[in-house]
């Protein structure tokens, strides 16, 4: 049994991951915003499935720190796995998003991950072990027009998590990026749209493309061959079952759109960079000996 903290567990991938891992007998703490408010019913449902709901808003330092303290207090100071899942999506003409909208996007998708890592890593370093699974996207490797700002936040995670993996390898902490394709979750139902519709209107026919893309995507999600979002929970469970030191640094889930090829092509280049810096030893995680 492992102790796991999952962010963004009120719906979508996060909720499915929480329920899947709890069913496997793990001690799961499901991070949920407004746990006693609009998500009270969801919290009760998670609890019924064997997970422990924890109030957690990744955009607030105090909330993140309190959630990690609660987990450590309830588990006797143990935390084995952190799943960075909380995220929001955006779609539209990039110029028509305001700076405040982009800031909100990065606040959740990037800064939220940094908050969780700062809160959890001291425990992982002290233990000499830990696994951080971050839900990225294939759009952190390839670019879809009109999804560029969302993609930018996921590209940021790629560099961020790579650096953390090197820096924490000798402390026995592993990092894996899960890169899902498009799946029917409520993240798309609540996708961030441009606040400056007038600016988007200046693009004419091109400005109408994202709406058509979105309609096509929704049609695919509602069709008989819609991709199964449970694929992501299964990928996370498989990573957890893989022995320490043998996990891949990236896993593409669903239709790759070339992201898998990009991963394979970039890996030797990155290795050359690290070798050139004389830091090859940081590329291999130091696995804690079994007691």
Show where each model-derived region lies.
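Residue(s) in the substrate-gating loop at a strand-loop-helix junction
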Residues: 137
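Active-site helix of classical SDR
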Residues: 117, 153
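Conserved glycine-rich Rossmann-like NAD(P)H-binding loop of the short-chain dehydrogenase/reductase
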Residues: 24-40
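Conserved glycine-rich cofactor-binding loop
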Residues: 10-11
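SDR active-site lid
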Residues: 170-247
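Substrate-binding pocket helix/loop in short-chain dehydrogenase/reductase
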Residues: 93-94, 101-103
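The beta1-alpha1 cofactor-binding region of Rossmann-like NAD(H)/NADP(H)-dependent oxidoreductases
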Residues: 56-69, 99
């Amino acid at each position: 049994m492992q102790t796991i903290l999952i962010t963004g567990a009120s719906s979508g991938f996060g909720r499915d991951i929480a329920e899947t891992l709890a069913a496997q007998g793990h001690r799961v703490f499901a991070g949920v915003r407004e746990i006693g408010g609009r998500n009270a019913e969801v919290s009760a449902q998670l609890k019924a499935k064997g997970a422990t709901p924890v109030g957690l808003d990744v955009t607030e330092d105090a909330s993140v720190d309190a959630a990690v303290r609660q987990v450590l207090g309830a588990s006797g100071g143990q935390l084995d796995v952190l799943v960075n899942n909380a995220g929001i999506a955006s779609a539209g003409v990039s110029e028509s998003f305001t700076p405040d909208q982009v800031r909100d996007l990065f606040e959740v998708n990037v800064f939220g991950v940094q908050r969780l890592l700062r809160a959890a890593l001291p425990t992982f370093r002290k233990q000499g072990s830990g696994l951080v699974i971050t839900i990225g996207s294939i759009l952190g490797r390839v670019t879809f027009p009109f999804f560029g700002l969302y993609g930018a936040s996921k590209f940021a995670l790629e560099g961020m998590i790579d650096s953390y993996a090197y820096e924490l390898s000798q402390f026995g902490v592993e990092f894996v990026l899960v890169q899902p394709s498009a799946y029917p979750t409520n993240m798309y139902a609540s996708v961030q749209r441009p606040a400056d519709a007038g600016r988007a209107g200046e693009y004419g026919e091109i400005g109408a493309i994202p709406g058509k893309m979105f309609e096509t995507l929704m049609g695919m999600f509602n069709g008989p061959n819609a991709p199964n979002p449970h694929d992501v929970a299964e990928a996370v469970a498989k990573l957890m079952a893989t022995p320490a030191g043998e996990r891949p640094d990236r896993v593409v889930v669903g239709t790759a759109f070339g992201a898998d090829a990009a991963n394979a092509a970039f890996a030797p280049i990155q290795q050359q960079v690290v070798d050139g810096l004389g830091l090859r030893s940081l590329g291999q995680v130091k696995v804690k000996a079994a007691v």
